């Protein structure tokens, strides 16, 4: 079983043309779970009940700024509104596309802040392709973390890894993909292995005694708590192989 699971991972790396700087993390059932996993890794996600219990207040001046596009799926915008960050939506231009001038204005105004940008590659509604190469180039010039929602685009195209730092995918949108798992593609340098994993479950630990624990250093291992989605991950791999 482990062998088939790792073969699936290697197949995904090949078919998605991923560099050695990235890892693939199976996440829930689709892009929504992949975005949540990303937010957890970057310290942005916080459960609403925790907010209520401890009365969290965000200082807009010091919180990360998350920039999103004008036609994002709810998961790629509303979820960030509830996270520990400030959200800025980029306007549409006169042609109904991403207003790149507005993007530059927002970046210049906030260049002193930590900036995370998350744009869809293709609209779930219209299929319009976002100018992701130009957007990435602009964001890189401001040292922003670049994220792409590839839910609607990955059945048809790959995105070169130098253009992004994290990508969210829903293999269930591919032929043969239903019942697969969501995928988070993330640059290894964004994952802090000096702290506990996002969930300290079975399989994430290296050693445990009565009072302390040491966690695995391998990112894929420490970020797949409990029983891994073996069949779902293999199905995702086969779907991209068929593509």
Regions found by a protein language model. Give the residues of each.
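Pyridoxal 5′-phosphate
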Residues: 1-243
């Amino acid at each position: 079983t482990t062998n088939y699971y790792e073969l699936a991972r290697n197949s995904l790396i090949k078919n998605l043309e991923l560099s050695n700087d990235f890892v693939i993390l199976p996440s829930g059932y689709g892009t929504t779970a992949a975005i949540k996993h990303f937010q957890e890794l970057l310290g942005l996600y916080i459960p609403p009940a925790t907010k209520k219990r401890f009365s969290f207040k965000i200082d807009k001046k010091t919180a990360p700024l998350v920039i999103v596009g004008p036609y994002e799926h709810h998961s790629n915008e509303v979820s960030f509104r509830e996270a520990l960050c400030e959200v800025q939506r980029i306007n549409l231009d006169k042609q109904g596309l991403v207003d790149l001038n507005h993007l530059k204005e927002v970046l210049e105004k906030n260049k002193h802040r930590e900036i995370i940008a998350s744009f869809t590659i293709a609209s779930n509604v219209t299929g319009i392709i976002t100018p992701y190469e130009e957007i990435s180039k602009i964001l890189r010039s401001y040292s922003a973390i670049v994220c792409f929602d590839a839910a609607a685009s990955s059945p048809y195209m790959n995105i070169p890894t130098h253009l992004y730092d994290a990508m969210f995918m829903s293999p269930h949108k591919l032929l043969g993909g239903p019942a697969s798992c969501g995928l988070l593609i993330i640059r290894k340098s964004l994952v802090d292995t000096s702290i506990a994993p996002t969930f300290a479950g079975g399989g994430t630990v290296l050693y445990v005694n009565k009072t302390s624990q040491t966690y695995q250093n391998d990112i894929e291992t420490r970020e797949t708590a409990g029983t891994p989605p073996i069949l779902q991950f293999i199905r995702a791999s086969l779907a991209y192989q068929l593509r």
